[in-house]
């Protein structure tokens, strides 16, 4: 397992306002949050087919491909080759059908889970051996509904859970930036604790004037 810190963080998604709030753009959502945290702005780089930000102090590039999901690897491969970034130094953040909203999975290499953005990324990098942060969006329950599902906005309660998971991922960024992948994996892959139920309000105590008098005394 790679121990090198990431030099390139990629958020997968589709360009355009019509896709900006759809489940498939979860990777973009994380990259936008990370750019805000690092104090950098994206600009379009035609040679890299995407929106690019250079966080020099953090030593990391941020990339949001503008090639549409199924051709994400074109952008990733172009930037990685130009700056000589090894696949093991790349973190790809993407939506994941097989994980419920609110949960995350950090993994290195392995299968692609049928994700077209990952398939194209692996094709252009020539390997599956790069880091992925899988952002749970849930599954519609019917494989025939998957395309329609990922290209629609999440329900309000689901979006709240997804946003909370992205906040947890952002909180783990300092650990990721150091290349401490083991600690980050343990932290991000743990299921979030369920919210504690609110405490029942205490019954009001009667005021002293309302207390019954003791008639046994003379």
Swiss-Prot record:
GO MF term list: peptidyl-tRNA hydrolase activity; tRNA binding
Pfam families named among the record's database cross-references: Pept_tRNA_hydro (PF01195)
GO cellular component assignments: cytoplasm
Residues forming coiled coils: none
Binding residues annotated for tRNA, in chain numbering: 19, 68, 70, 116
Listed GO biological process terms: protein quality control for misfolded or incompletely synthesized proteins; rescue of stalled ribosome
EC number of this enzyme: 3.1.1.29
PROSITE patterns assigned to the protein according to its UniProt record, in alphabetical order: PEPT_TRNA_HYDROL_2
Reactions catalysed, as given in the entry: an N-acyl-L-alpha-aminoacyl-tRNA + H2O = an N-acyl-L-amino acid + a tRNA + H(+)
Site feature: Stabilizes the basic form of H active site to accept a proton: 95
Keywords: Cytoplasm, Hydrolase, RNA-binding, tRNA-binding
Region of interest (Disordered), ranges: 181-218
Main localization of the protein described in the UniProt heading: cytoplasm
UniProt site (Discriminates between blocked and unblocked aminoacyl-tRNA): 14
Subcellular location: Cytoplasm
Feature: compositional bias, Pro residues: 192-204
Catalytic residues (UniProt): 24 (proton acceptor)
Known partners and oligomeric status: Monomer.
UniProt similarity note: Belongs to the PTH family.
Function: Hydrolyzes ribosome-free peptidyl-tRNAs (with 1 or more amino acids incorporated), which drop off the ribosome during protein synthesis, or as a result of ribosome stalling.
Protein name: Peptidyl-tRNA hydrolase
